[in-house]
From Swiss-Prot:
It comes from Arabidopsis thaliana. Keywords: Ribonucleoprotein, Ribosomal protein. The lineage of its organism: Eukaryota, Viridiplantae, Streptophyta, Embryophyta, Tracheophyta. Belongs to the eukaryotic ribosomal protein eL32 family. This is Large ribosomal subunit protein eL32z. GO terms for cellular component: cytosol; cytosolic large ribosomal subunit; cytosolic ribosome; nucleolus. The gene is RPL32A. InterPro entries: Ribosomal_eL32, Ribosomal_eL32_CS, Ribosomal_eL32_sf.
Amino acid sequence: MAVPLLTKKVVKKRSAKFIRPQSDRRITVKESWRRPKGIDSRVRRKFKGVTLMPNVGYGSDKKTRHYLPNGFKKFVVHNTSELELLMMHNRTYCAEIAHNVSTKKRKAIVERASQLDVVVTNRLARLRSQEDE
């Protein structure tokens, strides 16, 4: 099992959900964020008690950005040949098997990953053990 190269603790500062202003009042206004541009907009003018706007202060530490809590960066893998790319970077990146990969290929990917000493985050997904009767 590869040990992550990252020694710094991964800390997510804040996880505010930025929703579009007035999306809670009107059905036609969806929740996905849009920057308010109106001349009288309370959100744009940053009044107290209104929807928060995303800004630089919500970003995480540059050194730990995109890292998972296990200390690795995620790399989506569809087959064993894509897994070979992680051979030299197994202390920085971990593999995540894509959702549309069959059980047969999943077994091959997990087996090859153990040979290459690459961490697989979802190694048990869709792999069931069958009992012989």
